[in-house]
Amino acid sequence: MKFHLLFFILLFSITILTGKRSYPEYGSLDLRKECRMSKGHCKLQCSENEIRIAFCIRPGTHCCI
């Protein structure tokens, strides 16, 4: 059983961790920061003169420009 655990840990470290190091653009994305960079605001509801473009951190909040 210990061998299986060791094998799983080695397999995980070889595949997942090296892939994240090789391709950092596929890592996590801060949607709130991306919304602010596009001059938007994270709100629960966009007003009539604003355009909703994406979701922010929570699925209920929208990025309104």
From Swiss-Prot:
The keyword Disulfide bond applies. GO terms for biological process: cell chemotaxis; defense response to bacterium; innate immune response. GO terms for molecular function: CCR6 chemokine receptor binding; chemoattractant activity. Has antibacterial activity. This is Beta-defensin 17. Coiled coil: none annotated. Belongs to the beta-defensin family. Residues 1-19 form the signal peptide. It is found in: Secreted. The lineage of its organism: Eukaryota, Metazoa, Chordata, Craniata, Vertebrata. Keywords: Antibiotic, Antimicrobial, Defensin, Disulfide bond, Secreted, Signal. The gene is Defb17. One of its GO terms (cellular component) is extracellular space. Disulfide bonds join C35-C63, C42-C56, C46-C64.
